[in-house]
Amino acid sequence: MRMRHLKTAVMPAKGDPITGRVVVFGNSDVEMAMCVPAEKMDYFYKNAMGDECIFIHFGSGTVHTMFGTLKFGPKDYVIIPKGIVYRMTFDKTKDGEQAPRFVVFETANGSHIGPPPRYLSKKTSQFLEHAPYCERDLRMPELPLTFDKKGEYEVRIKARDLVHSYMYTHHPLDVVGWDGCYYPYCFNVDDFSPIVGKLHMPPPIHQTFEGHNFVICSFCPRLLDFHPDAIPVPYNHSNLDSDEILYYVEGNYKARKGIEPGSISVHPQGIPHGPHPGTVEKSLGARETSELAVMCDTFRPMFPTKAAMAFDDLAYPQSWEGEHFPVSLDQHHADGAHRKPAAPTKVKSKTAAKKGKPTKSAKDVGSTWQ
C-alpha cells in the first residue's frame, strides 16, 4: 500500500468503447476503467450488473439508447443505469483534436449512481436551492426512436461476471415511447456550480454523484478561499475512512507537481499526504484556480490492477522528500526496489479467496482487478 501516480496519457488506443476499457482500480463496490477506443461498436451492449458513470475527457459523439439519443462532448458525465441497451459512437476526430478518451465508474454491488440525497427535497425529490446543480442542467434522451427493421442484431449482455452474446431478429432500439424516472442522461461538469468559502472547504462540497460505499466529486475552476490569511491549497491530512483517487482533466492543480492531463493520483486510507514541497508558498495570494479533476472516494480499499502498474510512476512517493512526514515505502520500494520495475501484487476477491481460485470476470469489458 502506497501513494501512486499513474501516467495514463500514454495509454494506447485499443478496442471499441466497451472492449477497449482497461480497469485500473476496483473493489467489491466499484470499478474504475480507462478507455481510448480505436474501433467502432458494431453491436449493442447491456450492462445487467451495474450502473455506469462515464466521464468524457476528449471526443464527442452519440449514445444511442432504447430511450432515444444522447449527444455528448468533452467534460460530459454520461449516466447509464443498468439494464439499458445502448451503443456508443464517436464523431470523426478533426485535425489537431485529441483522440477520444473517457473514464468509467461502474458499480459492482448492485447500487445505483445518482445525486447525493442531501441535494434533494425529501418531500418532492427536486433539487434544493443549495445544490451545485439542478434538473435544468441534466440533458435527457432526445426523441424516442423507432427502428422498424428486421435482421440480425447482436446484443452483448454483461451478467454473472461474463459477457453473453445474443442475436435479435429485430432492432434492439425499436421502442415507440417511454415514461417514468429511470433513464440515461448527460451532465456537463462546466454546469457544476462550485461552493466556495472564506476558509478551506472540505471535499464533500465537490460531490457530484454517489453509489453505495463511494462518491464521485468534481474539482472545478473556482474562486479560492478569501480570508486574508487563508492558505488556498489543502493542508496535510490522512483519509481515515476512504481511498482517494483523482483523475486530472485540465488546468493547473496547485497542490501537486508533475501532474498532467490524464494523470491519476491515488492516496490510500491512512497514509498522510498534502501539498508538495514549495506549493504552499506559491499558492499564497492566489485568487482562483483553473484546475479540473474528477475524484472517486471509496469507503473500502481499492486495489490496482496489473494493467494499472504499466503506468505507475515509481518515484511518486519520493516527491514529498523534505516534508515533515516520512516517505512511504512498501514492498516494491524497500532497499532500492523502487528503482526497478515492480511486479504487480495479485489480489483476489472475497469470493475467489473462499474458493481458492481467481474470480472469472467479463473478458470483453476488462474486469481484471480480481
What are these regions (language model features)?
Residues 1-370:
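Jelly-roll (double-stranded beta-helix
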